[in-house]
Amino acid sequence: GTIPCGESCVYIPCITSALGCSCKKKVCYKN
């Protein structure tokens, strides 16, 4: 929840979710 994964999730889910990233406030974050 603190580290940006450099990916947005406005229209599609986080592809980086495979790396443990999750969507928060239209941006993918890790931890």
Curated annotation (Swiss-Prot):
GO BP terms, alphabetized: defense response
InterPro entries: Cyclotide, Cyclotide_bracelet_CS, Cyclotide_sf
Pfam families: Cyclotide
Cross-link (Cyclopeptide (Gly-Asn)): G1-N31
Keywords: Disulfide bond, Plant defense
Modification after translation (UniProt): This is a cyclic peptide.
Entry keyword Chaperone: no
Keyword set includes Disulfide bond: yes
Disulfide bonds: C5-C21, C9-C23, C14-C28
Family note: Belongs to the cyclotide family. Bracelet subfamily.
Known role: Probably participates in a plant defense mechanism.
The record's note on its domains: The presence of a 'disulfide through disulfide knot' structurally defines this protein as a knottin.
Protein name: Cyclotide mden-M
Source organism (scientific name): Melicytus dentatus (Tree violet)
